[in-house]
């Protein structure tokens, strides 16, 4: 290379830097030309410009707009039309009259614990969603509906009109989302965000079937607009974010596969080189597809299990063990930086144990995974507390805000430990953490904690609603899981809404005004596993207790755990 060429390359550092680039270019890590109202790089790439951060020069002062081509002129209906004038990031006087609800919603979504969120996901809730709240009516309506729901059903600030404001705003948001879906005026991403917020509203009100429908709608919309065959209309970073939400479906409902189809098998190079959260999301997505297929064979004779299912089980376990090996938590005291990795490891460990036992009908099979269960508990205990929670999670004169995050976090792993690890002290440590873990998507720590308590009472022969505190020092003999016999162990359990009625299509409809919809915990226990396998284990079944004489079932009230 000649000296002249080398010198020319070095002068590149003198090019004007992009300090106020649009959110889309920043997420893609490309230089933005800062054209207003939409940057030309986004338009040329057929992407929706998400607007500019606070402090960015206005259209009149932007040097790049003076010579912009006609392509840079965006119609008023585009996604970033609101970003063409003054800064719009969480400015109170630019919000609608219902701004307190939007501010409450954004505060909850931004300031809840990080858990497994990566940097892009943190920016998504702190920047992209507030930006779209100003520029897209359907997102604004959905955000305000979420704020109303949180205020009425979580904070319970006005018990006399519970649900009325939420219902009114929910209907408005639903109509605007349907209008956006029919026209795609602002592209798919605002529609997906609106669907996700509507699903969160249903989850907070414990109408999980309706929430499932909204989440599936967002995932179907994402799948149809992120195809690699055509020009994708959604950044792949956001595809990864929504793909993670699909795991809620598989973890919450027993034997249900994720909505999105499985991806090609992940390679060792991809496990090693990819970001931990993205590689784990892909591993878990494939794993829960396997678990869904294998669950039907859990209570069958070993000889009728297809050999390819056993081979697939080995492949899934190998992938998860490799991920755990590649993503160790550093021994140094860096909990703040490792919070996301700690949470990801708990999710992987829970899936590893579940996949290992999914083809074994005996609950005693879980006793072999004490180290994995105990690492889940110690990892959650090592998470840093929410910084200045009393100050940062307050809203006006309301009480301290309870955390809510749409993404997966720690509730499912803790709930899994409390139910399946029969060590007396470790399961109580998991239960103690569970009831304080807030809300994550369809999961509620308080509700899952109450359901897990019923399992502990049943398995340990303790009177219903008795204290679960253990007096005295640790006793390795008494605490050993082997003390709980197979015939006393609960196989399946979960919160149910017994007051709900099914319509002619089997859909569950709840009383709109009811605060609590999950009022009971449904428990299934096999009295004689060997006799059940002998009499009923000749064909795969998703509900082995139906038509069998070897199962007992009952319901306990869901009572708060002190």
What are these regions (language model features)?
Residues 188-196, 335-358, 390-435, 443-458:
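Amphipathic alpha-helical protein-interaction segments enriched in hydrophobic
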Residues 132, 150, 201, 355, ...:
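Residue-level signature for tetratricopeptide repeat
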Residues 55-58, 78-136, 140-149, 154-312, ...:
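Intrinsically disordered, low-complexity acidic/Ser/Thr-rich segments used as protein-protein interaction/activation
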Residues 176, 183, 221, 323-327, ...:
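Residue position in alpha-helical solenoids
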Residues 302-396, 405, 421:
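Long, repeat-rich segments with strong aromatic
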Residues 1-28, 44-129, 135, 139, ...:
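Intrinsically disordered, low-complexity regulatory regions with latent secondary structure
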Residues 169, 176, 214, 372, ...:
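Alpha-helical solenoid repeat scaffolds, predominantly canonical TPR units
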Residues 20-23, 30, 37-40, 344, ...:
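Cys/His-enriched microdomains
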């Amino acid at each position: 290379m000649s000296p002249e060429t080398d010198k020319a390359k070095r002068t590149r550092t003198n090019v004007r830097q992009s300090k106020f680039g649009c959110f889309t270019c920043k997420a893609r890590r490309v230089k933005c030309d800062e054209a207003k109202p939409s940057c030309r790089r986004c338009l040329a790439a057929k992407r929706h410009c998400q607007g500019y951060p606070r402090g960015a020069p206005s259209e009149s002062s932007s040097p790049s707009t003076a010579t912009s081509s006609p392509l840079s002129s965006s119609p008023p209906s585009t996604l970033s039309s609101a970003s063409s004038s003054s800064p719009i990031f969480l400015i109170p006087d630019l919000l609608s009259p219902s701004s307190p609800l939007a501010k409450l919603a954004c505060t909850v979504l931004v300031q809840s614990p990080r858990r497994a969120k990566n940097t892009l996901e943190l920016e998504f809730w702190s920047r992209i969603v507030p930006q779209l709240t100003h520029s897209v009516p359907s997102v604004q309506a959905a955000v305000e509906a979420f704020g109303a729901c949180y205020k009425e059903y979580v904070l319970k600030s006005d018990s006399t009109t519970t649900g009325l404001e939420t219902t009114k705003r929910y209907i408005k948001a639903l109509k605007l989302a349907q209008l956006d879906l029919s026209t795609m005026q602002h592209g798919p991403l605002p529609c997906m965000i609106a669907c996700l917020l509507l699903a969160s509203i249903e989850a907070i009100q414990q109408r999980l079937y309706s929430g499932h429908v909204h989440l599936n709608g967002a995932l179907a919309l994402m799948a149809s607009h992120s195809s690699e065959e055509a020009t994708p209309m959604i950044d792949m970073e956001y595809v990864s974010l929504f793909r993670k939400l699909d795991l809620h479906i598989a973890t919450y409902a027993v034997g249900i596969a994720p909505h999105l189809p499985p991806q090609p098998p992940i390679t060792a190079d991809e496990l090693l080189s990819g970001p931990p959260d993205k590689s784990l999301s892909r591993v878990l997505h494939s794993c829960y597809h396997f678990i869904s297929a294998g669950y039907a064979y859990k209570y069958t004779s070993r000889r009728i299990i297809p050999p390819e299912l056993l081979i697939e089980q080995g492949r899934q376990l190998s992938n998860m063990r490799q991920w755990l090996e590649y993503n160790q938590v550093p021994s140094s005291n860096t909990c703040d930086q490792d919070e996301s990795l700690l949470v990801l490891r708990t999710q992987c460990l829970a899936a590893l144990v579940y996949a290992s036992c999914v083809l074994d009908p005996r609950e005693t099979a879980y006793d072999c995974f004490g180290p994995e269960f105990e690492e889940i508990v110690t990892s959650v205990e090592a998470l840093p507390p929410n910084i200045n929670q009393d100050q940062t999670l307050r809203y006006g004169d309301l009480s301290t805000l309870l955390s809510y995050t749409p993404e997966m976090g720690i509730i499912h792993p803790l709930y899994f430990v409390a139910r399946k690890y029969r060590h007396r002290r470790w399961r109580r440590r998991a239960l103690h953490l569970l009831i304080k873990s807030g809300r994550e998507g369809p999961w509620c720590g308080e509700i899952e904690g109450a359901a897990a308590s019923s399992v502990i009472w049943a398995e340990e022969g303790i009177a219903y609603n008795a204290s679960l505190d253990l007096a005295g020092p640790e006793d390795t003999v008494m605490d050993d899981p082997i003390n709980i016999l197979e015939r006393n162990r609960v196989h399946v359990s979960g919160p149910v809404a017994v007051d709900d009625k099914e319509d002619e299509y089997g859909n569950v409809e709840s009383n709109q005004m009811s605060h609590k919809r999950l009022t009971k915990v449904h428990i299934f226990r096999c009295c004689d596993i060997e006799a059940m396998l002998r009499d009923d284990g000749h064909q795969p079944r998703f509900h082995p207790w139906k038509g069998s004489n070897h199962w007992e079932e009952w319901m306990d009230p869901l009572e708060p755990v002190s």
